Amino acid sequence: SSGLEYALVAYWEQTGEVSPPPMLTADPVEQIVVVSGSCSPVTADQIDAAEVEGFVLFPLDTAGFVDDRRDRVVERAILDVCALVSKGKSVIAHTGRGPDDPRIAETMVALEQQGLTGETARMTTAERIGRGLGHLLRGVLEETGLRRAATTGGDTSYYVAKEMGVTALEAVAPM
């Protein structure tokens, strides 16, 4: 089993029979852009910590991401985030800062106006916001030439990757 494999490797590293693999790291960058579709308390704490470290927070119009204004809202966000990046800022474009963010209720109202409720509304939200964030991220990266980006949220990350044409990921270093 993999548990036995991990235990053996750890033991062999302790006894000096094998050396631990070299730690891979990413080269530092001056700026990064992050799209966040997670409303979890953990993500909210991470956003708060990033703000303390100098990231500019860009709250997104999530209701606009799920209704017929979607294309205009995303294109406007691309322009606004690019303007912040052009000023040398690292940016987190986010759909919420925790489970109590008022945008969650606003988004659900927008979906209810389209006749969507319950699980259908939840899945529609994940897809529309995720795809919108993917479009936003791709647009910002193309316009600015930034070399590093990140995304948060399980469903969000899936749709962002899909929207950006990502077909595979490879872990090369611990996070």
Label the model's feature ranges.
Residues S1-M175:
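Active-site catalytic microenvironments in core metabolic enzymes, especially phosphate/sugar-handling
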